């Protein structure tokens, strides 16, 4: 998860010198806490750039074929997760998007920025995502797979996980 800083299994206190500790001290609103985990909040352009710059740095400094994200973005559908960021957004625009659409817009902006910076860092590098096998679940967690497939500038490929034995894959072809 490109937004996950730590899980409940991570030590309770990270090093005071860690990038998380430094940023959290200055800008605590850049983070969301959920079930013992801490996540970057993609509502903020700085956060999206931080993730995209990290992906570009990997492409620039290491011999990699590309960057791959798993399917998890927002850790929950719960409106309380990012309620303060959403409230700030609602106050600053004339016609705000509903919460789930706003979250999808944030993640799509993140995905597009990562794509652009990865391509700038290494034009041959690819960028892909493994979305969940159920489009509705993706949309509820912030992933707009349909939009990413419908327009250039988001991903080079999608690689949904194979279903477990006894499960059916719920993907349809979108072109």
Report each predicted region and the residues it spans.
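Active-site-adjacent "subsite" loops/lids of carbohydrate-active enzymes
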Residues: 1-61
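Secondary-structure transition into beta-strands, especially the periplasmic turns and strand N-termini
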Residues: 60-63, 121
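Glycoside hydrolase catalytic-domain groove-lining segments
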Residues: 78-175
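A structural motif
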Residues: 63-64, 155
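Short, solvent-exposed loop/turn and secondary-structure capping segments
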Residues: 6-12, 70, 78-81, 140-141
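Conserved, mostly hydrophobic/aromatic
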Residues: 51, 58, 67-70, 118, ...
